[in-house]
Amino acid sequence: MRVLGLFERGNNLNFADTYVYTWNKQYSFHENAFLISNQVATTIIIYLDKEIVNQVNEAFNLLNSNGIPALIIKSDHIGIFTSSNFTYDWQNKIIYFHEYTYYKNNEFIVSDEFWLNTSIQDLLPYKVLFFERGLRKLYEGEEYILYNTATDDDIIYKYIYEKDVIMSGNDYSKLYDTKSFKNFVHFMRLLRMRFAVPFDQLSNRVTRSRAFAKSKIHIGLRNESIPQALDNIHHYWINYSANGMRVSELKGSGSYSEKKISEFDIGQFKNYMNFLTLMFYIKNMKKKPSCTIIGAAPGYWIPSMKKYFNIVTYDDKHVDSTEHYNRYFTDDDIASVKTNGVYIDVRSDFKNYDWKKRRQLVEEETMRWLSITYKLLENRYVEAVLLKMTAMDIEIPDGYFVHFPTTYRKSEYYLLVDKQTVKRPKIKITKSLAYGAINTIFSDNVFISGKYSLKGKTEGVLALYCLSNTINPKEKVVQYANSFSGTCMTVRLNNTYILNKIIDFKTNADYTFLPSDFQCSIKTVLTSYRGYAGVFGYAITKDLKSDGNNHIYIIPNARDDDNFDTFASHLGLSRYSHSKRFSESATTMSGYLFRDMVSGKENMEDTDTENLASGHVFNAIAHYRFDYTYDIVGWLKLHKMRKFRVKSNIYGEHTDDEIRNAIEAAYVYYLLDGDEVGKEYAKRIMEIWDVQTWG
């Protein structure tokens, strides 16, 4: 949903699902905002004049803080605003569109410049374009700035990590005769144009920035947080991602099995991922990361990293780094290293030898660089080293096994060690064990750390999309959330129809939760992604899907004590019931009639004006799968404590009977639907209401 104000009237109705709202001057901006938010159209247009513009702006402020984008636009921008989903930074007047119209211009967009130095351009019938952070500026004026954030990065990543599975599927096989990158891109674009635009992924790139900057401890970071981690690299923070496999954890066996991973060179991708892995590992040591790279050329990714890190390079080819030595690194250079990280990516050219001699030389060279690594870690500056290894029988420190995909899978992997690691007993690793790992394990996350413990203080913690994991007992997660005082945490919403549903994934599983599971502080807001966006200064156009991958956002200290409606309020709460009522019900008054019938009312003559149950409470419970932005748990507690405050002239306090009747009506609604999860939710909401004493 989006609300657009226009000063110029024009042919603005030639858009599907658009409604022109007539501002009611008899109503306050609160009531107008409420009526606007509950329209079922996806685009609401309001024609403005000088008489109403101030009131409209007040309503727009309220809508935006509730995560519903509302702004005055230029009339010649009406097309893109009505046809594209976007995330609106209403604090800074920046609109981030998430749309792929550039496909009609035969463009392929990437956000990492090193892709321009590969053969991608030769393999595709599109023009490959680079925009830093994927931000393509469309317009800049006094009113606002427009960007498009859509890229094809995700297609490249899926190609690198998932192409074998995708291109072996029946759908792909029926459409294409060959397994090529060109066909893969075409197939993924087909899926995208089939209403599969990754809005959540694109929007999260924007909205997590503010939450990240406010946090000191990050749980469950993954690669999508790289931009925010880089932006805050000089501020204090650490992460707990429970990611990374130590050498001692490797199992299985294998043998040499060369495989071409990509049609185009992804060696730069591998080096970039390795570098970031090392830098963020050192960041977790509470130090400002810096790096010496030995064997850096061509290093196309290095120039973009110079603004975040001091990077010293050694190579006989030129590299655009902070400080470059146009020669090979030797033992004599060890004492002069002043960076706290060293990345060793050296492999001499032994192609003129037969394979036995070549293997001997590769192993000898590996041993030499391992010896240099030990000496580097005796240097008072160096904290950690990431070095290239080869599959061989060897004793090595119990460091982290790092193996990001590169163009060909052969015999190489990387070992991440630090000062403490090399002091512990070494691990014997066989050539067979190494090949088993190389052939089956690919790293996919640059954030390596230990597991986070759900104990202790939670100030400054940000935990997005990670704590539902069955690694932790469900009751411990609930206890943690109840006392959580960090920036924000999420748990997966149970929008299924199975009580206590556990959702399985390839390598793990998630518990599911209901808002009624928690007993958080009264200042904590429980809401949807839309509500979370509003709290952090954003608004989003995309409506929730009832069966989507949805999370409950638990945000401490977000409550506006003077005005509940500022964040996660009832705005937009009735959209689903309106839509269902108009399309499926016997009468548009069915909601009123249903609630009063359950409440035992016999005379229905005034049911639409003097009903016995709260419509807001009923909708929040009965239709939670479709919109759980409204913090019903917080509202009920504040209401009964008589601490509920709202700056509105349309609010009337509900009686105990009105709220009980609404909860009972929601229970009966679910009962008639055979919905066990819904019934349980209504029962728990009633328990929350019962246990709270009147203020």
UniProtKB/Swiss-Prot annotation:
| Swiss-Prot/TrEMBL keywords | GTP-binding, Host-virus interaction, Methyltransferase, mRNA capping, mRNA processing, Multifunctional enzyme, Nucleotide-binding, Nucleotidyltransferase, RNA-binding, S-adenosyl-L-methionine, Transferase, Viral immunoevasion, Virion
KW Isomerase (keyword) present: no
Q: Which InterPro entries match?
A: VP3_Rotav
Renumbered residue ranges of the record's region 2'-O-methyltransferase activity: 256-432
Return the PROSITE patterns for the record: SAM_MT56_VP3 (PS51589)
Q: Name one GO cellular component term.
A: viral nucleocapsid
Q: Which residues lie within the region annotated GTase/RTPase activity? A: 560-695
What would be an example GO MF term here? RNA binding
Provide the top EC class: transferase
Enzyme Commission code: 2.7.7.50, 2.1.1.56
Region spans: N7-methyltransferase activity: 187-255, 433-559
| Function summary | Multifunctional enzyme involved in mRNA capping. Catalyzes the formation of the 5' cap structure on the viral plus-strand transcripts. Specifically binds to GTP and displays guanylyltransferase and methyltransferase activities. Has affinity for ssRNA but not for dsRNA. Capping activity is non-specific and caps RNAs that initiate with either a G or an A residue. Together with VP1 polymerase, forms a VP1-VP3 complex positioned near the channels situated at each of the five-fold vertices of the core.
How is the quaternary structure described?
Interacts with VP1. Interacts with VP2.
Return the similarity comment: Belongs to the rotavirus VP3 family.
| UniProt cross-references to HAMAP family, sorted A to Z | Rota_VP3
**What is the protein's given name?**
Protein VP3
Q: Which organism is it from?
A: Rotavirus C (isolate RVC/Cow/Japan/Shintoku/1991/G2P[3]) (RV-C)
